[in-house]
Amino acid sequence: MHDAIDHRGERLAHREKKEMSQALSKAEQQRKAIAERMDKHSLLASEGRAVVDQDDLFLEPPANVREVLSDSLTVAKTPPRIEFAVIPYGFRYFPELEGDKDVGPWSSWGQACYYPAEKKFFGAVGDHGWYDPNLHVVEYDCAAASVRCLPEINTLLERKPEEFGEAKIHGYPDVYRAPYQKNDHLWFCTYWCRYPEPLEHDFASGYTGGHIMSYDLASKEFLDYGVPLVRASWPYHRVDRQRGILYGIGMFGEFLAWDINRQEIKWAGYLPPEMKWFNRCLLIDEASGLAYSNNAFGESQKIIAYDPDRNRFRELPFDMPKDRQYNCNVYMRCHTRERGADGLFWGLTTLGSLFSFDPEGEKLEVGERLWPLNDAYSVTMDRSPGGRYLYFGVASHGRGYPYGSPVLQHDLKNHTTKILAFLHPYYYEKYGYIAGGSYSFKLDEKGERLFMIWNGDFNEIEILDKERRDYDSDNSANWSVPSPHDAFGHCATFVLDIPPEERKE
């Protein structure tokens, strides 16, 4: 590990991870055999090249969705063109582990970023491991219609196999160029995969916490800025691009405000008494500099604000409304990255109700659920450049396929929700791939292309359907917690070309 970090970050030498020599576990041998049998077009060996489809079958809803279409949902008239690529990470299957270790499944948990200068989208995947884990930033090249994994993060950090590591990038990767940098950088933080936190022997192995890192988009080098808060790791992070402040939220509500330009900590630690930052939401109003989230302390239903100029927190003078259907507390969950021309952030609550937040007036309005069926949990949203449309998914935790793995568009002008495409069962029947759920929806600068990383699996649908029998989807508390029927293990990118007639502003 590196004890001394340069003021401007340490450039990490390129290192390739060594191939594993251990034999696969029996369960992994079986999983590999099923995946290779289901992979009808050898996409696992395609090295990230996309296949392209445009089919009216994208617009065919499953029976359970068809029942609610006339009342709550519509389906697009024109099928989109979709590029589909399996992400080509190494070490796809795992050996038998000894001792207190865990690994798998390969999965993607962070948001996505678009870099218009190179027409590339970025996201992340990892193997959820504790020791000798694998974590990659993912790059999708629109011109080449292909996806690749950038060098493995733990290897770049020179973590040894016997040292606890990290296998998630769980927040927003953001592009920002500091005054001392010649090029644009992609900024992010790392996150552990043992919950609620590593054990004492994990820390004793040499692990100290989550890192701040960046990727030089011109030189293609990674930089490490070290661990800003010992024994904290970062399930959520964002960058205020106007002020150069990187925000991180820890597992236990630790709050990080780190000045990229000065390489200085503004705040690192817990909030004042009876305040706890919700670690799955961070609205940054770049016009005012204020940041917002829910207060996760106790039964509080307040929203809290952080002012970086005053370095102070405060509660807003109103409560977040309870969910209308379930009469329970909810938080703001997915949301647009910035306020739009209407002055509003838009998003969905933890149970899928549409909300808008006005940072100037500090007012919140909560409306109806946009997805009328169960599993309305959504963690990703983007807004069209003209502001009329919101794009989002549902059943994000790997369980969208019972509903057709829909890609949704909400029209803020007409107050209607439209399904642009059902990814399931089309990709299962043609390619053997079950599209589970996505944590990353990102539009290009024109709002014409929608990039998504989906968690999914090359598996027999009967296996997952059997696991789903005991799942109670009527209990909303189950929507965001792991279930045996979640489709994980083989991450893929989908790039959807939205037909012009389906996105008129």
Summary of predicted features, one role per range:
Residues 82-101, 150-171, 226-231, 270-275, ...:
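Surface-exposed loop and turn segments in beta-propeller and other repeat-based domains
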Residues 114-118, 181-183, 240-243, 285-288, ...:
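Residue-level detector of Asp-centered blade-edge/turn motifs that repeat once per structural unit
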Residues 373-412, 418, 422-426, 431-440:
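Loop/turn-rich, solvent-exposed surfaces of beta-rich toroidal or solenoidal domains
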Residues 141-144, 216-220, 259-263, 307-311, ...:
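Short loop/turn segments that connect beta-strands within beta-propeller blades
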Residues 88-135:
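Beta-strand-rich domains and repeat architectures in extracellular enzymes and scaffolds
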Residues 129-134, 196-209, 251, 296-300, ...:
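Short, solvent-exposed loop/turn segments at conserved positions within beta-propeller repeat blades
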Residues 432-505:
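Blade-level signature of beta-propeller repeat domains, shared across WD40, Kelch, NHL, RCC1
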Residues 107-111, 157-178, 231-239, 274-286, ...:
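Repeated scaffold domains used in trafficking and secretory/extracellular systems
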